[in-house]
Structure formats: structure tokens, C-alpha cells
Amino acid sequence: MNSPADYDPKPRRASVAVDVGGVIVGGGAPVVVQSMTNTDTADIDATVRQVAALFQAGSEMVRITVDRDESAAAVPKIRERLLRLGMDVPLIGDFHYIGHKLLADHPACAEALAKYRINPGNVGFKDKKDKQFGEIVEMAIRYDKPVRIGVNWGSLDQELLTTLMDRNKEQGFPLSARQVTREAIVQSALISAELAEEIGLPRNRIILSAKVSQVQDLIAVYSMLSERSNHALHLGLTEAGMGSKGIVASSAAMGYVLQHGIGDTIRVSLTPEPNGDRTREVQVAQELLQVMGFRQFIPVVAACPGCGRTTSTVFQELAQNIQNDIRKNMPIWREKYPGVEALNVAVMGCIVNGPGESKHADIGISLPGTGESPAAPVFIDGEKALTLRGPNIAADFEALVIDYIEKRFGQKDAAE
């Protein structure tokens, strides 16, 4: 019979720590949230605005496309503008096809970036592949930059895949085509990492990723990678899709591997709605890590889903208002109230679970359900503190939450 401890998250996989512009990835460090812009990098103003928005939303690293000379020339200017805004966010250069040439032709770009992303599937073809891969690695060594060797199933090394498919055929097809493709993805990452180390890039300068678009494939390839190397791993489900589908797919895939101790940095690759908010992917990544108990980014507002006992919408509106206020104020609160991200607030809709849930929160309210007395007990630190009545219950509770934050988390400032 298993013990209760057997159902806890698996210990974090031991991986080599990599310093990316001052942010540590792997080596037992907290799982890092990152994101990517969708602006034309050559448009400096637009890119600075989006990087700033992603950074303020909580992205700890931001990847930008470097696809041509104009983009490469813009990178140091983008970096300089961000620093003037007080945003020392590591910028990751996303290179495909001609990264070796762009880094050589634009040394200021090579210096400004905190990390280079290399795709082994399109860094070069046939006899040029290893040569051009090596040139990027040599640039990373010259400028003391880490690289992410990012394999993607959509641009997988076809020579390697063909070799493995042929071998599988010779052996009588013991593996399905899907299983062979997974093996090719893993081998592409490991072979490339081995080549980078042979050239002279140390392991503490290498991060691996193996992006796929199906949940089961992600679970498989990262499980395989984790067993066969100790490189820091970047998790992400590529082409996850839009809206709830993308959120569910990314959460299901990454949640499983994170629970098994695998993963050192994550990106949730959501397709935004037209003119949608790019920062949504950062919020989802943070929420995934927070609900799994791996990190704390923002106070939690627990609220019941509602039922026939809660025909009023007051508790829903109150929970939403508090959550919105928290998100709006977190950039200030994070500095003013250290530790506030650990706060738990409960907004419950009736007597069934309301008092119990509110007692478990730092501060909670149990609003009256249908037919209940129009009174709302408030619990603070597990004890009933007072009862709110009248038409201003919501506003009164919001004021109590602010007062609680100031008293509990503002003490450190007051003592200094």
C-alpha cells in the first residue's frame, strides 16, 4: 500500500543550472516563466511596448524574433530602451536559417541578447548543417551567452528522421511512426547538445527543448529527455491553439511533467485573438505553476462556482472585483508589501461551504445564499472577526482586504 507521501509531486529532476541574463534556469531554481513577442522586431517602438507589457505581467525572460538584418540591428536599441525604463529583462534571440550570419554581421545584437535559440532542424542543411550550427555556438562562446537548442517537430531534421525510419523498417517495424518521430526529436536535441559541448560550449550554457503540438507527445519526449540527460529543460506545447483549447492542452501536458519533477522554464504558447492581449500567456503560465504549488506570483482568490442556493450574483461580482484589483495593484504591491503574493482570500456564496472555506483563507467572507439571513460573517486568520450587513457589504469587504494587506505585509516597511 502506498503512503500519503507517494502522491506528492516527485522531487525536481537534477539539472545543470544556466544563468540567462541573471535569471537562473535549472539547478533547483524556481521554474521560470517566459514569453515571446509577436511584433516585427525591426519596429523598435512596438517591440519595446510589448516586451515591457510582458515583463510587467510577470514574464522573467522574453524571446524576440531575429530574422533579418533590420531585426538584428534593432536588438541593441530595444535593449537600451528597456533599460532606460528600468526593465532589465533578459532578451532571447530566436534564430532560424541565417542565425550564424546575423550574429556575425551584428556584434551589438550578439552582445545585447541574453540567450540564443538555435533550431537544429533548420540551422543548415546537408554539409552546411554542422558548420552553421558550430558558428552560432562559437558566437555564444565568444560572447559568453547560453543557448537553447530548440527542436520542433514541425521543422525536425529530416535526415535524422529518415535514418531512424529506415532502421525501424529494417528491424520489422517494432515502433510506430509516431514513436520513431518522438525518438528523432529527442536524438536531435541530444546530438546537437553533444556537438555544442565538443565545440567548447559548457553544459551550464545549454538548455534543451523538444516542442510538439500533442499532449501525449510532449509527455513522452520530455520523459525521455529527462532520463537521458541532465540539461536544463524548457517546456512548451507548440501550436497549442486559441482560447480554452490552448490553455487546457498546455496545462494538461506541462502539468503532468511538472508533477513528475521535469521542467526548469515554461512558456504557454497561446494563439491570441485578433488584437488580443499577448500577456494572457504569462498569466496562464503563472497560474499553472501557482495552482500546482510550485510558485506564488499573486494572491489567490477562492470562490465557489455557485448553485441553486446562490441565485444572487453578488459573490461573483465581489470575487471578480477583488481579483481585478489584485492584478492591477500587484506591480506596486510586490514592492510595497513583500510576501503579499502568498495571500489567500475566500469569497463564498452561501452557508454550506462558506464559513469553512473562509476559515482556511487568510481573510474570507461567507455571503448569504438564497433565503439566508442578510448577513455576511468575515473570517480573518481562521477566526470570525465581524459580520457585515447592509447594501455595502462588497465595498466594506474590499476595504477589509486592503486593511489586512497593509497590516500584515506592510509591517516590514514600517520597521525599517
Swiss-Prot record:
Pfam families: GcpE. Pathway: Isoprenoid biosynthesis; isopentenyl diphosphate biosynthesis via DXP pathway; isopentenyl diphosphate from 1-deoxy-D-xylulose 5-phosphate: step 5/6. Its EC number is 1.17.7.3. It catalyses: (2E)-4-hydroxy-3-methylbut-2-enyl diphosphate + oxidized [flavodoxin] + H2O + 2 H(+) = 2-C-methyl-D-erythritol 2,4-cyclic diphosphate + reduced [flavodoxin]. [4Fe-4S] cluster binds at residues 304, 307, 350, 357. GO terms for molecular function: 4 iron, 4 sulfur cluster binding; 4-hydroxy-3-methylbut-2-en-1-yl diphosphate synthase activity (ferredoxin); 4-hydroxy-3-methylbut-2-enyl-diphosphate synthase activity (flavodoxin); iron ion binding. Binds 1 [4Fe-4S] cluster. Its cofactor is [4Fe-4S] cluster. The keyword Metal-binding applies. InterPro entries: Dihydropteroate_synth-like_sf, IspG_bac, IspG_bac-typ, NO2/SO3_Rdtase_4Fe4S_sf. Keywords: 4Fe-4S, Iron, Iron-sulfur, Isoprene biosynthesis, Metal-binding, Oxidoreductase. GO terms for biological process: isopentenyl diphosphate biosynthetic process, methylerythritol 4-phosphate pathway; terpenoid biosynthetic process. Belongs to the IspG family. Converts 2C-methyl-D-erythritol 2,4-cyclodiphosphate (ME-2,4cPP) into 1-hydroxy-2-methyl-2-(E)-butenyl 4-diphosphate. PANTHER family: 4-HYDROXY-3-METHYLBUT-2-EN-1-YL DIPHOSPHATE SYNTHASE, 4-HYDROXY-3-METHYLBUT-2-EN-1-YL DIPHOSPHATE SYNTHASE (FERREDOXIN), CHLOROPLASTIC. NCBIfam families: ispG_gcpE, PRK00366.1. This is 4-hydroxy-3-methylbut-2-en-1-yl diphosphate synthase (flavodoxin).
